[in-house]
Amino acid sequence: MILSTVGYHWEEAFGAYDEFRNGGWDVALFTVDGSPPKVDPTSLKRTGPLSWFGFGVSKANSPESPRGRELMAAIEGLRPLSDLDPSAIDALYLPGGHGCLFDVNRSEALHGVIGELHRNGKPLSGVCHATSTYAFVEADGRPIVAGKRFTGFPGFVDTIMSSTGLVQREFLPIPFSNDQALADAGAKLSWRNKLLAALNPRYTRVDWPFVTGMGPKAARGVAREIIRSQRHTYPE
């Protein structure tokens, strides 16, 4: 799991971490340069029923929960991406948050790791703004996402949120559109897909080796698909 040092979304990391740990997996945490990650403060706000839609966080999923404390301890011991051995991991998961658009998504070092994992047929996953990371990786001169069904945080929702003050100022202007980057690389992202993603906070798409989700509430579903994929051979 690669966390942003500019601003990752808490539940997008927590939800997947919780599912992986429940499934008996070890989870290795990294940042691009080994610096401490920074959580987007809006993702830690207690918002009551709104947390069901991915706005803020519930008490059960907070850093103060038992699993939250475990994750916080793991974050204290994270390592730089240069320490990641692609041959030693079973899958890659990327939590989003607007901050990842500034450091994780365009990291050439991470692109190299992804390229090796892709060559070896390992599952590649992510949610929200992190999904466009895969748009910048090529194999044999072609984007690895070309022709693949993807989802992530819709650009039109970003536009609405930015204009209504729902995005932290430090993330503005948003450096690029998550879904536009994917579309430019040839990923399949129809308006129907974008609408479904906007209406269903748990929306996920599977097109191996990729497993992607709309946002915070999709993190658990993405992790479950990855866990299932290791029990069965997924289709080419």
Residue ranges of predicted features:
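Short, thiol/selenol-centered motifs that function as redox-active sites or metal-ligating centers
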Residues: 126-131
